[in-house]
């Protein structure tokens, strides 16, 4: 009788824990859980519930990756603006006692856990827009004056701490676009083709993506998608499948994921998830477990993180996109 070793040339590993680095088709026996396991490629995406934020909030910002994420700012009812900052390690959130210098909601962020950027937002008393820009070094936030040239809230953004991009926002709805060089913001006279607030954004300063949002006129939600090349915005005639506002997204211009938000005319929250390939949006059969708007995000199209949101929640969810390697338990069925 043929054996696995004879066919493959090696024996199956006996491990007390699943390996942190694995390859497609790798098989092992987990001696702790007493099951056989294999690594396979996910054919569709899926959401899994993670550990909650320490501070429940809405209209917060995020940065980083699925295993090294950052959550900051936001609000708790009725209108308490937050400066609190939390770091995620792939399992749990840890609060940093040193928060933002300017507590606010409806702000935007970009960068990584140890080098993040926060900008814009809404202050008390409402409605007071903020232009404040802060840099995070993994421990503390530093305010960088003078901030955005156009103070605004509920804007889109993307990029890094030294090459950021801000676009759109409200409540006086704008398409204004600004670029950050690590020291100051410069206004690009060419703004979004569709001015809007409560939009999603992701990518880099020279390859940005703007999608969805509220253009300020009925039906108040748009599917509009635009790509930025470092100079101008180009509208993609193929927009989102679900028009929405107050949602989020992450990834790059050619591989993005959008999720959550608020939809009309049903006036309900959604957990709908869509994938962008640089040309078209495709609706995923998998929706978030907790439908919500005003949430934060981090990560990539294949490994994203969604957290917080409204109704005010601390819920965290991890997204595994199609094509990602996943661990499965081998059964006889």
Task: List each model region and its residues.
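Polar, enzyme-active/binding microenvironments
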Residues: 1-333
């Amino acid at each position: 009788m043929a054996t696995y070793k004879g066919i493959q040339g090696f024996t199956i590993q006996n491990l007390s824990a699943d390996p942190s680095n694995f390859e497609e088709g790798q098989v092992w026996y987990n001696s702790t859980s007493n099951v056989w396991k294999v690594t396979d490629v996910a054919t569709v995406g899926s959401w899994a519930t993670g550990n909650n934020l320490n501070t429940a909030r809405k209209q917060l910002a995020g940065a980083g990756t699925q295993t090294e994420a950052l959550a900051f700012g936001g609000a708790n009812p009725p209108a308490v603006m937050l400066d609190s900052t939390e770091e995620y390690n792939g399992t749990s959130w840890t609060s940093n006692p040193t928060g933002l210098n300017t507590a606010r909601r409806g702000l935007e962020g970009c960068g990584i856990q140890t080098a993040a950027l926060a900008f814009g937002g809404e202050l008390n008393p409402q409605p007071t827009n903020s232009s404040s820009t802060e840099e995070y070094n993994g421990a503390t936030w530093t305010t960088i004056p003078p901030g955005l040239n156009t103070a605004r809230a509920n804007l889109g953004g993307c990029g890094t701490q030294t090459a950021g991009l801000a676009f759109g926002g409200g409540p006086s709805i704008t398409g204004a676009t600004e670029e950050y060089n690590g020291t100051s913001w410069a206004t690009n006279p060419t703004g979004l083709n569709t001015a809007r607030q409560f939009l999603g954004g992701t990518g880099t300063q020279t390859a940005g993506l703007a999608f969805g949002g509220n253009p300020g006129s009925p039906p108040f939600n748009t599917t509009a998608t635009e790509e930025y090349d470092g100079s101008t915005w180009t509208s993609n005639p193929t927009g989102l499948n679900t028009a929405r506002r107050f949602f989020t997204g992450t990834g790059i211009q050619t591989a993005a994921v959008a999720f959550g938000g608020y939809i009309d005319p049903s006036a309900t929250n959604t957990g709908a998830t869509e994938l962008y390939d640089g040309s078209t949006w495709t609706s995923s059969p998998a929706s978030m477990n907790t439908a919500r708007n005003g949430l934060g995000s981090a990560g990539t199209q294949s490994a994203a993180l969604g957290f917080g949101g409204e109704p005010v929640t601390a819920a965290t969810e991890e997204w595994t996109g199609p094509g990602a390697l996943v661990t499965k338990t081998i059964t006889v069925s």
